[in-house]
Amino acid sequence: ALKSLRKVQHLIRKMQAKLTALCTDADLLKAIHPTAAVSGLPQQQAKKALAEIETFDRRWYAGTLGVMSQHLSEFCVTIRSAFIEENQVRVFAGAGIVEGSQPVEEWLEIERKAAGLISLFAENNGE
């Protein structure tokens, strides 16, 4: 499905499964995190490269947020997030870099994604 937001569009895929007694919610979460969308493939090499290249702590960005109960678990990937400390807000957003990606276009995509979050913190909600 296509989800249109104010600044960007996303392809969305919902997944649902009934777990067997041999697989717990935590097992499934561990198996799918981090998603290739935020860490890259092949996963081990991509994670190593990110650790070497990125000079900042991702905080909640690209993490997993959700609820787990006896009867239901639901999670999402935090593909946009903000960290507020004292009078400073750090906004996190990213782009899917693949073979053939154009750096300028990817950077503009990141700026569009971040703009939605930034507008929430603007003094007049849109400055």
Role assignments for model-derived ranges:
Residues 1-51, 122-125:
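Contiguous alpha-helical scaffold segments within structured protein domains
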Residues 36-45, 49-127:
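Glycine-rich, small/acidic residue-mixed loop/short-helix segments
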